[in-house]
């Protein structure tokens, strides 16, 4: 059996700098240390764990990656693949697939695991839905994933912009299946407004990531709430029983097997159909450190556990990400044609 790679020292969390940070400027990105410096928690320097043999990324040759990047820039589009430093970017781009990130590239949250920039976002780009639809049609995509930064500055959390993008894609590419990976729409009345708006043009798959176990939320997802995310998933499913719901969990942040299993049970109890489970990789030294590399055998055990709970599809493996091979995941759950 593969031996786990883990820290021999406990994670130490220190409170953020008490000095008031400089005011945010609209559209200016706070990344890496600048972003985490504004977070409620920061992390004491610790030795970096050596990546085990099963954490490897193939970088394919050819011009496909650069060609796709050029097309995205031409249409002023952003992918979460680039902004979040996804390890699978070269594989996905080389196959002509991408997860589009709408509503800008500046997030109002400061999650300690995420490499997307923090700051004060610009207003939504009214031309973005049309540009996205053109790109999807040009690429001939049969399955597309659309996600966004958190937009706590918007009354609907960006739900109307999601609907505008869905409608535009369906107009130009009626046979394309659409998965949306949404923020939590947290805030007074925001979830209600968002769900009412999404009902106007719902996706083929509704995805919202739970990310981690509840005990780790204060350090991993400051500004988010575990039960709120579960409720969002359940309420969408209640409104749209025939639409698949999906969520994702990262491993390696300090959780235990028992905690992960409990989270899987919570997701099923809240009517989530599909689940992705993958290894967290630290994007910069300023972010939450990797506490442990889970083994392939453990991912297999979680896949079997999830199947036993009744998920329609479980994708569990070190390099699995929420939208990695999303078309295959959906096909396995009976969504994509």
From Swiss-Prot:
SUPFAM superfamilies: Radical SAM enzymes (SSF102114). It comes from Xanthomonas oryzae pv. oryzae (strain KACC10331 / KXO85). Residues 93-312 form the Radical SAM core domain. Belongs to the radical SAM superfamily. Lipoyl synthase family. It is found in: Cytoplasm. This is Lipoyl synthase. [4Fe-4S] cluster 1 binds at residues 81, 86, 92, 323. It comes from the Bacteria. The keyword Iron-sulfur applies. GO terms for cellular component: cytoplasm. Binds 2 [4Fe-4S] clusters per subunit. One cluster is coordinated with 3 cysteines and an exchangeable S-adenosyl-L-methionine.
């Amino acid at each position: 059996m593969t031996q786990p790679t883990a820290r021999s020292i406990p994670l130490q969390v220190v409170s953020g700098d008490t000095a008031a940070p400089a005011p945010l400027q609209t559209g200016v990105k706070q990344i890496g240390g600048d972003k985490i410096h504004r977070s409620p928690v920061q992390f004491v320097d610790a030795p970096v764990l050596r990546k085990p043999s099963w954490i490897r990324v193939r970088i394919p040759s050819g011009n496909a990656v650069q060609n796709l990047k050029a097309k995205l820039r031409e249409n002023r589009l952003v992918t979460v693949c680039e902004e979040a430093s996804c390890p699978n970017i070269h594989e996905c781009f080389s196959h002509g697939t991408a997860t589009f990130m709408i509503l800008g590239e500046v997030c109002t949250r400061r999650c300690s695991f995420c490499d997307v920039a923090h700051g004060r976002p610009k207003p939504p780009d009214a031309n973005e839905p049309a540009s996205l639809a053109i790109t999807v049609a040009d690429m001939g995509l049969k399955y597309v994933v659309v996600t966004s930064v958190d937009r706590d500055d918007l009354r609907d959390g960006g739900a109307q912009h999601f609907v505008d993008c869905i409608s535009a894609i369906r107009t130009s590419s009626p046979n394309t299946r659409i998965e949306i990976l949404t923020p939590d729409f947290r805030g007074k009345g925001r979830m209600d407004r968002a769900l009412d708006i999404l009902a106007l043009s719902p996706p083929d798959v509704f995805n919202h990531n739970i990310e981690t176990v509840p005990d780790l939320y204060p350090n991993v997802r400051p500004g988010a709430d575990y039960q709120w995310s579960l409720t969002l998933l359940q309420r969408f499913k209640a409104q749209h029983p025939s639409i698949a719901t999906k969520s994702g969990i990262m491993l390696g942040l300090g959780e235990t097997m028992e905690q992960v299993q409990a989270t899987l049970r919570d997701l099923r109890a809240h009517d989530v159909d599909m689940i992705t489970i993958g290894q967290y990789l630290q994007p910069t030294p300023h972010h939450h450190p990797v506490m442990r590399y889970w083994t392939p055998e453990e991912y297999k055990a979680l896949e079997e556990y999830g199947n036993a709970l009744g998920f329609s599809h479980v994708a569990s493996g070190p390099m699995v990400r929420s939208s990695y091979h999303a078309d295959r995941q959906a096909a396995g759950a009976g969504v994509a044609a």
